[in-house]
Amino acid sequence: MRVDLFDFELPEERIALRPAEPRDSAKMLVVKSGEALDDRKVGDLPSLLRAGDVLVFNDTKVIPAQLKGIRRRGEAQAQVEATLHMRVAPDRWLAFMRPGKRIAAGDRIHFGHDGNSCFLGQLDATVIEKGEGGEALLGFDLSGPFLDEALHAVGHIPLPPYIASKRDDDERDRADYQTIYAREEGAVAAPTAGLHFTPELFAALDAKGVERHFVTLHVGAGTFLPVKADDTADHKMHAEIGSVSRETADALNAAKARGGRIIAVGTTSLRLLESAAREDGTVPAWSGPTDIFITPGYRFRTADMLMTNFHLPRSTLFMLVSAFSGLDTMGAAYAHAIANRYRFYSYGDASLLYRAEMSDG
């Protein structure tokens, strides 16, 4: 499909720079093909669900994966930034480097020299390989938990580009850009639909008889990469590592068997479920990398509903929601959201989408 089919005008002021307070006070647009759009609040979610429904959350935890450093090559040096996006060994990460042209295989990079202290006072790495598009494989001098400790000391929360271009990250982001149920460290971007949930909302959902279960997909920085191709067939997704436990798989299959609805909280949860699912829609225990890229025409096998934030024009995530609820439906929903001053992107408002039986896109 042509990528420009997923383009729309988004006023810059509609991009949220901070989350709503409290988290569950954010707006939520309910979108069901063929029915009127319904303006609600995230706190209304329990009233829109029924006993026996299942919410599926991504419990990945964001790490401070943005690093500022100095590249040294002999006597020459230059400032560089690295955004880690996939761990491939206890001491090795794939990273997007800026500016990529300043690094080469064999370079030494000294991180943590921007005023922060870190474990042993420094965090050094060697460029093992240089890939395409500014990507590089970094081998750190520290490994395992020692590397993790150093990253927490010197790293910054990797805010999405459209937010980072407006302001620097701060201590507040370390809490704001993390779900309250995050537990499995490894993401460099938050599963942002989950940011809306509070203990009070969980209690209300429990009282309604709505189940919640967890999967893990370590969201990579590739989620922010722009689609540069003119056709979706020419876009390549970066792989992310995920897993579905036996406990969660059994719970989802049991819920579907008794007629309960599966509600994916966030596109990351949905992409992982679709990666794991069998043809008949059942979900096995699963783990591994996924680079699934969902566009209109895709046949969904798992979720009946999707809770997700409002995404950017021409993004792979807007393509996914268009596949889920229909391109025309989502075009109308986003026009309504912009006209009614919904807040977009990672810190923005939410939508609750019903799956279209057949894409109108």
Swiss-Prot record:
GO molecular function terms noted in the UniProt entry: S-adenosylmethionine:tRNA ribosyltransferase-isomerase activity
EC top class named in words: transferase
Localization in the cell: Cytoplasm
Highest taxon listed in the record's lineage: Bacteria
Gene Ontology terms: biological process: queuosine biosynthetic process; tRNA wobble guanine modification
Record flagged with keyword Repeat: no
Catalysed reactions, semicolon-separated: 7-aminomethyl-7-carbaguanosine(34) in tRNA + S-adenosyl-L-methionine = epoxyqueuosine(34) in tRNA + adenine + L-methionine + 2 H(+)
Primary residence: cytoplasm
Family under the similarity heading: Belongs to the QueA family.
NCBIfam families for the chain: PRK00147.1, queA
PANTHER family (alphabetical): S-ADENOSYLMETHIONINE:TRNA RIBOSYLTRANSFERASE-ISOMERASE
Protein name per the record: S-adenosylmethionine:tRNA ribosyltransferase-isomerase
Organism: Mesorhizobium japonicum (strain LMG 29417 / CECT 9101 / MAFF 303099)
